[in-house]
Amino acid sequence: MWKTVVVCFAMLVRAGTCFAAGSAAADLTDTETRWLKGAWPVIAFAKSQAIPLDIVVQPQSAPGIAPISLAYISGRCKLVLSMRGNVEARATLERIEPDLLAATLELMAAHELGHCRRYLDGAWNGLPAGFVAAALPDDINPALRLSYSDMKATRREEGYADLVALAWTQQHHPSLYPRVHAWLLAERSKDLIPGSHHDTLVWVQLAKDATTLVQSSTFASSTALWAAGLALDN
């Protein structure tokens, strides 16, 4: 199942290999090359917008890690591929219908770009003006309250990133939007634990109609609908 994570700094320091177009391409595996090719329209967009985005290919074995994720280090976003020794990287590609693969890989890359945008805006884990996070349930073990609060904040960020991904699809693959949306909805519904980190259904369901994401930019479209989802979620 596709789940994204925010990669820790220490992991990248231990074994991160930066990749630039035209360099070290021969060292990439076929799986890494396919993911990068699929993500490239989003990467090119980030470059055109002067978004500080680097690509990091993890050379070590990474079983059980999300194949694609994001880190934020020293003011720069890192799009991280963790695919070696990771059966999920290839399995994810094989589960997607061939004619939907390009659009779906862009969706996943755009999701990570959504995380990047929030970091660059200094808004990570923040709420829009006028919103206050719902109070924690009284019956939560005091030792778990901070973890619960962090989980809720992560869930909000995942919801925003999913909307950025869908807004990208609406703008770049409008004819495929219903199918890509259905794919994402199915992914978020698998093994769902309500209220957990990747329970973004409130936002994904709001975006079933592609016209809800028609705005001047990918990020503007996402922000408006994200706020609507926050209101429902609270």
Predicted regions and their residues:
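Cleavable N-terminal signal peptides
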Residues: V7-C8, C18, N141-A143, A165
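Sec-dependent N-terminal signal peptides
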Residues: V5-V13
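N-terminal signal peptide c-region/cleavage motif recognized by signal peptidases
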Residues: A15-A21
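Long, well-structured alpha-helical subdomains associated
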Residues: S147-E158, L163-N234
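Zn2+-dependent metallopeptidase catalytic core
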Residues: T29-D54
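Active-site scaffold of zinc-dependent metalloenzymes
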Residues: P67-A103, A109, L113, Y119
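Post-HEXXH active-site segment of zinc metalloproteases
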Residues: Y119-E158
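Second-shell loop/turn segments in exported
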Residues: D27-T33, P67, T92-T104, L146-R155
